[in-house]
Amino acid sequence: MAKCAICEKGVTVGIKLSHSHIRTKRTWNPNLQRVKAIVDGSPKRIMVCTRCLRSGKVQRAI
C-alpha cells in the first residue's frame, strides 16, 4: 500500500479479536487522497493523507 508523501503514514498491522477470542491479523489503511500539489516549485500529483490536507501541510496547485 502507498504512504503519505508528507508524513509517511502507512499501513498499520494489528490483531482483530472476535467475541469468542479468536485472534486474526488485520490491517488499517491510511485515508490517502491523490492531490495535485506544489513540490519543489512545480505541480505534481502526490498521495497525501487527509490529516496533512486538513492541517495545511500541503500547498495545493490550481
UniProtKB/Swiss-Prot annotation:
GO terms for biological process: translation. Keywords: Ribonucleoprotein, Ribosomal protein. InterPro entries: Bacterial_rp_bL28, Ribosomal_bL28, Ribosomal_bL28/bL31-like_sf, Ribosomal_bL28_bact-type, Ribosomal_bL28_sf. GO terms for molecular function: structural constituent of ribosome. One of its GO terms (cellular component) is ribosome. Belongs to the bacterial ribosomal protein bL28 family. PANTHER family: 50S RIBOSOMAL PROTEIN L28 (PTHR39080), LARGE RIBOSOMAL SUBUNIT PROTEIN BL28A (PTHR39080:SF1). HAMAP family: Ribosomal_bL28. NCBIfam families: L28 (TIGR00009). This is Large ribosomal subunit protein bL28. It comes from Desulforamulus reducens (strain ATCC BAA-1160 / DSM 100696 / MI-1) (Desulfotomaculum reducens). The lineage of its organism: Bacteria, Bacillati, Bacillota, Clostridia, Eubacteriales.
